[in-house]
Amino acid sequence: MVTIRADEISNIIRERIEQYNREVTIVNTGTVLQVGDGIARIYGLDEVMAGELVEFEEGTIGIALNLESNNVGVVLMGDGLMIQEGSSVKATGKIAQIPVSEAYLGRVINALANPIDGRGKIAASESRLIESPAPGIISRRSVYEPLQTGLIAIDSMIPIGRGQRELIIGDRQTGKTAVATDTILNQQGQNVICVYVAIGQKASSVAQVVTSLQERGAMEYTIVVAETADSPATLQYLAPYTGAALAEYFMYREQHTLIIYDDLSKQAQAYRQMSLLLRRPPGREAYPGDVFYLHSRLLERAAKLSSQLGEGSMTALPIVETQAGDVSAYIPTNVISITDGQIFLSADLFNSGIRPAINVGISVSRVGSAAQIKAMKQVAGKLKLELAQFAELEAFAQFSSDLDKATQNQLARGQRLRELLKQSQSAPLTVEEQIMTIYTGTNGYLDGLEIGQVRKFLVQLRTYLKTNKPQFQEIISSTKTLTPEAESLLKEGIQEQLERFLLQEKV
């Protein structure tokens, strides 16, 4: 017979009590009052932070944007079709952040940094806040290194430096994306990480850009962040910040980055949609009052870091679409005032066959000239002046038929210079090639050719100089200056090729 000993039982009970550990987790919860149009109104969530992520019962994530006295306005990061009135919502205690790593290079992702190219997960051990504060004044230094776009018109007259913010602005179908993608292609071998953010674009357009970059081997150093036109407004609004967070990751690791936002008009429209649905008061053009801050806090993250922080840089090329060339609309004027210059693309120039359709007269770069190499400065000054005089003369020449010889010569020179600025898409030129092209035009070597022969001659000249005068390129790339020796080599090469070309044309 088993004897029951009271002390044993009391010991067992004591052990069990000591081992018992009741974990209490406090969850900040609320209830869905209303849901629809990508917006949910929540009752409860008393201690939620502005911008905090909240999780719905069925798994959808949202961001708390409006904190009102009796409810919280949440924007949804998904379609939210399964969310029901009365279902519960819990605050996560986190602000929106994304994983970051080198493994993102060559991938296409969405605004939440999830891959959408069907190539599996992306390994990442670190994460960054989507909304990070911009570097302060002490953390920056002035722009001094060039970021070459490969387009003669930009690199000579509207130069861009590493760490600059240069707006690309123009009507639809004027080649804004082409200028941006050509700039990405030209970074090959330059040790620059590129991030292309597509906001509210057609999926077919994004696929076209990705294919173009893949074919030319540019995806190796590029990340594409895409939220197409059918994405929820919340994700279209977040996409540029996600792109900026990825670019910042590389910038703070002492690397140079280039980020393209294509385009910020669509981001502003997505933000307007969210704000109006949240019943925030509308302002000019029905945009909310803080739409300027929407873009300024994004573009201020582009910087050239100081030497203490490793001299990394983030160059931003935001794109803004205008309606019928109206740059005095709300979003264009806002972004023009935030950026360090703008490149205007004109529909009239585009339709008249001048591509890239850059209106050099009203495009400016406010800090880039400090970043130009000396050799480019030596040849570009004359080009700017001659084109400005040509534009003025051309306007007068329309009204007068009898022009003196000097004016006729100046008009002929101007037409050839304009021809020299034309470039095919996806055919960026090196700085050395640009310098030889501009030098040929501004020193009158093209004056004897027909306008139709100019481009053909320049293509042959570049090939001829590359094979027969390689020292020219070596001098420019090593000294960054057009030395007397380089100039004499260039003159010889142009003269020799010009004679050969004229003989060919006669035959």
UniProtKB/Swiss-Prot annotation:
GO terms for molecular function: ADP binding; ATP binding; proton-transporting ATP synthase activity, rotational mechanism. Its main location: plastid. Pfam families: ATP-synt_ab (PF00006), ATP-synt_ab_C (PF00306), ATP-synt_ab_N (PF02874). PROSITE patterns: ATPASE_ALPHA_BETA. The modification Phosphothreonine is found at T257. One of its GO terms (cellular component) is proton-transporting ATP synthase complex. It is found in: Plastid, Chloroplast thylakoid membrane. The record marks S363 as: Required for activity. The keyword Plastid applies. It is an enzyme of class 7 (translocase). Its EC number is 7.1.2.2. The keyword Plastid applies. Keywords: ATP synthesis, ATP-binding, CF(1), Chloroplast, Hydrogen ion transport, Ion transport, Membrane, Nucleotide-binding, Phosphoprotein, Plastid, Thylakoid, Translocase, Transport. It is a peripheral membrane protein. It catalyses: ATP + H2O + 4 H(+)(in) = ADP + phosphate + 5 H(+)(out). ATP binds at G170, D171, R172, Q173, T174, G175, K176, T177. F-type ATPases have 2 components, CF(1) - the catalytic core - and CF(0) - the membrane proton channel. CF(1) has five subunits: alpha(3), beta(3), gamma(1), delta(1), epsilon(1). CF(0) has four main subunits: a, b, b' and c. Produces ATP from ADP in the presence of a proton gradient across the membrane. The alpha chain is a regulatory subunit. Belongs to the ATPase alpha/beta chains family. This is ATP synthase subunit alpha, chloroplastic. It comes from Lepidium virginicum (Virginia pepperweed). The lineage of its organism: Eukaryota, Viridiplantae, Streptophyta, Embryophyta, Tracheophyta.
